[in-house]
Amino acid sequence: MAAASSSRVLLAAVAVLAAALAGCGAGAALDDPAGLLRRAKEAEFAGWMVGLRRRIHENPELGYEEFATSELVRRELDALGIPYRHPFAVTGVVATVGTGGPPFVALRADMDALPMQESVEWEHKSKVPGKMHGCGHDAHVAMLLGSARILQEHRDELKGTVVLVFQPAEEGGGGAKKMIDDGTVENIEAIFGVHVADVVPIGVVASRPGPVMAGSGFFEAVISGKGGHAALPHHTIDPILAASNVIVSLQQLVSREADPLDSQVVTVGKFQGGGAFNVIPDSVTIGGTFRAFLKESFNQLKQRIEEVIVSQASVQRCNAVVDFLDKDRPFFPPTINSAGLHDFFVKVASEMVGPKNVRDKQPLMGAEDFAFYADAIPATYYYFLGMYNETRGPQAPHHSPYFTINEDALPYGAALQASLATRYLLEHQPPTTGKAKAHDEL
């Protein structure tokens, strides 16, 4: 009787344990996106990501200054037992999970903040005056660490290698290009990037094949004339008048020279000159940005911007010097999504959130340095992760001092990035041959 009783107790304990494991997302199959989402939504897991995101948010760092953020990333990777290499592009970190051999697929998160003062009053407000995570990069880092944790839980099941790229300086600093120049993406076949979106509903993802974000460049011009008294304009050469004509003429580049079906933008956002009501200054500085989806259109805009500024200044008897600032702010190419990866993304995302929650996204004239990876990696894909919830009230836009993150989005980002990587490895196994061959190392 004692033996039988002990057996029943043991069987009951086994049943309880099995039930617990069945309800635990950690036991989700690697090829089950919905199961990985359940894992990421578990209270402890989601709370861990929220904590990471808030710590990063409290201590924002600008491009190439992300030393504390990089240290946090490395500390968490150490805790997870994930190997990494550091530094790349000053503060960047590259980690790997899996076999160490092909195929290689990458996931990327940007780490930098913005030079702006946070206006949201809450417990985890930025502690650094004049700096704020106003674009969601704190969430991106937390989600990629969440993906890392999921992948590490399944490391023995991975059929290749997932490369985790924690990148500095997306906000105008061209951090992606410097990461590439430092050799971080060799042998990688595909890379996925994600951005939280303030206008896309929570639980919804959105993207499109082909151009998804525009190429971007900046320009600055110094227009020089001859200063003097405002009451004697005939003794001066007025650079303010010249700059005004330049600005009007620049607007004709899009309205009269660009194909209406080929979206382009030229915007002058900077005008500095003069400091007194009755003085015509010696010079004026103007500056702005230009955007296009096609490389040919982008290059044409660049050429014509310089021609128009120099020529129009000359008409007003002024001289102009144009600087495209590409040494400090490299031109961002258009972000182009691989058509093949789009079909793949739709399939995997539909399994996680349902087909109705995978939506088309109109191209944006904003720019993203994720585009640089297309110069070094055969297939690239960038998508948007919804976080809008009407019950939270109005959502301030990105780059606003009132911007906030709906932290309920973090599990979706962590699980989907992990699912995209693992499924990519499964579907892109190298062909087998009769003779064993040594794997290429990353």
Curated annotation (Swiss-Prot):
Extent of the signal sequence: 1-27
GO (cellular component) term, any one: endoplasmic reticulum lumen
Q: Which InterPro entries match?
A: Amidohydrolase (IPR017439), Bact_exopeptidase_dim_dom (IPR036264), ILR1-like_Hyd (IPR044757), Peptidase_M20 (IPR002933), Peptidase_M20_dimer (IPR011650)
Gene3D superfamilies in the record: 3.30.70.360, Zn peptidases (3.40.630.10)
Provide the top EC class.
hydrolase
- UniProt main location, coarse: endoplasmic reticulum
Where does it live in the cell?
Endoplasmic reticulum lumen
PROSITE patterns noted in UniProt? ER_TARGET (PS00014)
Coiled coil (UniProt feature): none
A GO BP entry is: auxin metabolic process
Is the Signal keyword given for this protein? Answer: yes
Q: Which UniProt keywords apply?
A: Endoplasmic reticulum, Hydrolase, Signal
| EC number from the UniProt entry | 3.5.1.-
MF terms in GO:
IAA-Ala conjugate hydrolase activity
SUPFAM superfamilies, per the entry: Bacterial exopeptidase dimerisation domain, Zn-dependent exopeptidases
Write out the transmembrane intervals. Answer: none
Q: What biological function has been recorded for the protein in this entry?
A: Hydrolyzes certain amino acid conjugates of the plant growth regulator indole-3-acetic acid (IAA).
What name does the UniProt record give this protein? IAA-amino acid hydrolase ILR1-like 1
Species this chain originates from:
Oryza sativa subsp. indica
Organism ancestry? Eukaryota, Viridiplantae, Streptophyta, Embryophyta, Tracheophyta
Quick one: which gene encodes this? ILL1
